[in-house]
Amino acid sequence: MVVFPKSLSPKHVLKLLKSEKNPRAAFALFDSATRHPGYAHSAVVYHHILRRLSETRMVNHVSRIVELIRSQECKCDEDVALSVIKTYGKNSMPDQALDVFKRMREIFGCEPAIRSYNTLLNAFVEAKQWVKVESLFAYFETAGVAPNLQTYNVLIKMSCKKKEFEKARGFLDWMWKEGFKPDVFSYSTVINDLAKAGKLDDALELFDEMSERGVAPDVTCYNILIDGFLKEKDHKTAMELWDRLLEDSSVYPNVKTHNIMISGLSKCGRVDDCLKIWERMKQNEREKDLYTYSSLIHGLCDAGNVDKAESVFNELDERKASIDVVTYNTMLGGFCRCGKIKESLELWRIMEHKNSVNIVSYNILIKGLLENGKIDEATMIWRLMPAKGYAADKTTYGIFIHGLCVNGYVNKALGVMQEVESSGGHLDVYAYASIIDCLCKKKRLEEASNLVKEMSKHGVELNSHVCNALIGGLIRDSRLGEASFFLREMGKNGCRPTVVSYNILICGLCKAGKFGEASAFVKEMLENGWKPDLKTYSILLCGLCRDRKIDLALELWHQFLQSGLETDVMMHNILIHGLCSVGKLDDAMTVMANMEHRNCTANLVTYNTLMEGFFKVGDSNRATVIWGYMYKMGLQPDIISYNTIMKGLCMCRGVSYAMEFFDDARNHGIFPTVYTWNILVRAVVNR
C-alpha cells in the first residue's frame, strides 16, 4: 500500500500512476489519492487514468470518474472528453458516448469541436448505428462544424462495414475533386475491407491508384494485401508485393510483415522462400518474435525438413524465450512424422519438466508412436495420462484405437473400447470405424455387424466410413448380395452412400464378372445425384478388359472421354493392356499416341505392356521399336522391362539375343530376379 505525504500534489500522483504498470493497481492508487484530505485531481491526472481504463477495458469505472470530474468542477480540455467518448465507442456503448458528448460543457467545461464530432461519429459506426451516423453528419451543418478529412474517413469506414465498396470508392473520388486529399488511412480502410471480402484484385487496383496519386502506402497496407493473397494461395502476387515493399524506400517491413510472409508462404508450400526471408531477417538483424519462429518451424516440419526446423527451434531455445505449448507441439509433431522417436521422447521430457503439455501434445505423441510401431510406448503414455492429470478426449480415443488397429492389434483396440465405455467415456464414429474396418479385413463380419448395433445404442450415427468398411468386408467374403442390399439400405439408416461406397461395390461386382449388376449401380449412382468419377470408370474398364469384353470396354472409354473427366496414365494402361490381350495392337498404339493430346505421358508400364503384346503376336521387330521409343522418351527400363524383352526374344529369336539385354541390365545396375533366371533356363531347355 502506498503511503502518501500529507501535502499531496497532482504531479506526485501522476508520477506514481505512470510508474505502476498494472492497470488495476493504478486505478486503486487513483482511488486512494481521491480520498486523500485536501487533495483534488488535475485534468492531466484524469486524462491519464481514463486512457489506462480504455486500454484495459475497465470501462465500468469510467462513469464514476466522469461524475467525479463534474462534481469537482475540474476544467478539462477536449482531449479528456475525447478519451471518454473513445472508450465508450471502443466498447460498443454509443448511447453513453452520446450522453457525454451532449454534456461536455457541463462535465468538462469545454465545447465539442470537430474532433469530438468525429469521435462520436466513429462510435456510431463501430456500433453499426447507421441512422445515427447520418443524423449526426447532417447535424454538422446546423452546428456550424465543417467536416474535415477524418470525418470523411469515418464515412468511408461506414461504407466498407456495410460492404458498399462502390460508395467508398465514390467518397475517395469526391474527396480528390473537392480538395480533401485522402490520406493513407482513407485508402487502407477500403483496401482492408476489400481484402477481407475476398475482392483482392479490387484492393490491389486501389493500392496502385493510391501510389499513382502520390499517397505513400504504409506497411499496414502492404501487410493487408500480402496476407490476403497468401490466404488465397496466390504466392506469386504476394511475392511481387513483397519485392515492391523492399524497393519502397519510404517504408520498411515490420515483424508483422515477416510473420505474414513466413506463415503464409509455408502454408503455400514455399519453404525455400520462407528460409530466404528468414536469412534476410538475420542479416539485417530484424526483430523476430515467438510467432516468427513458430511459423517457420511449422512450415519446415510440414515440408519434411525437420533437421532445419530443429535448428530454428534450438535457436529459439537459446534465446531463453518463453516457448509456448503450440510451438512445442509443432516440433513434437515434426519429430513424430519423420520417425525421430528418440528425439520426440527427449522433447517430451522437456515439455513435461516445463509444464508445457496439453491434451493435443498427448494426441500428437501417441499418434506418432503408433505410426512408428511403438505400441508399448504409446500404451504407456496412454496409461499415464490420468496420473498426470489429463483426461483423454474423443480425439485421443480415436487416435489410440486407430493406431492399434492399423498395427494389427484389433483385440487390444476392442479392450480399450470396453475400458472407455465402462468408465463412462464415449467414442466417436471414427474410433468405431477403425475397429469395424479392421474386423472386416480380418473377416470377422459378425463382430463388425454387432459393433454397428452397439454404435446405435450409444447414440453414434453411422457414417460412410463405417458403411464402406462393411460393404468391403462383405465383398471380400463373397457375399455380394448382402453387400448390394446393405448399400441400398444405407439411406434408411441415415447414411447416404457416397461415390466411394458405389466404387467398392462396383469393383466387387466387376471382379465377379457381374457387369450387368455393376452397370445397374452406375445408373443408380446417377439417379441419386452422384457422378461416376475416374475410379468408377477405371474399375469398370478394368473388369471389362479382364473379361475380354473389349468392344464394351471401348464403348465405355468413349463414354468416359465425353464425360469431361480428366483421364490418367493408369486408365490408359488398363485399356492398352486389354487391347493387347486380344491382339488389337494397332488400336493399342493409337490409344498411346493420343495420350499426349490428353496431357498424359506414357510410363514404363505402358511400354512394357505394348512390348509384351507385340511379342505375343510374334512381332519382335515392333517390340524392339517400342524399346527404342522408351529410351527416346528418357525412361530407364526396369527389371520388368528387361524380363519382358528377354522372354520375347527367347520365344522369337533365341537365347543369344536375350543375353545381350541380360548383360545390358547388369551394366545398368539392374540385377536379375528368380523370374529372369526362369526365362533363360526355360529357353535353354526348350532350344
Swiss-Prot record:
Q: Is Protein biosynthesis tagged as a keyword? A: no
What domain of life does the UniProt record list for this protein's source? Eukaryota
Name the InterPro entries for this protein: Pentatricopeptide_rpt, PROP1-like_PPR_dom, TPR-like_helical_dom_sf
Each PPR repeat occupies one of these ranges, namely 42-76, 77-107, 113-147, 148-182, 183-217, 218-253, 254-288, 289-323, 324-358, 359-392, 393-427, 428-462, 463-497, 498-532, 533-567, 568-602, 603-637, 638-672
Record keywords, A-Z: Repeat
Q: Which PROSITE patterns match?
A: PPR
UniProt name for this protein: Pentatricopeptide repeat-containing protein At3g09060
Family in the record? Belongs to the PPR family. P subfamily.
Q: Matching Gene3D superfamilies, A to Z?
A: Tetratricopeptide repeat domain
SUPFAM superfamilies recorded: HCP-like
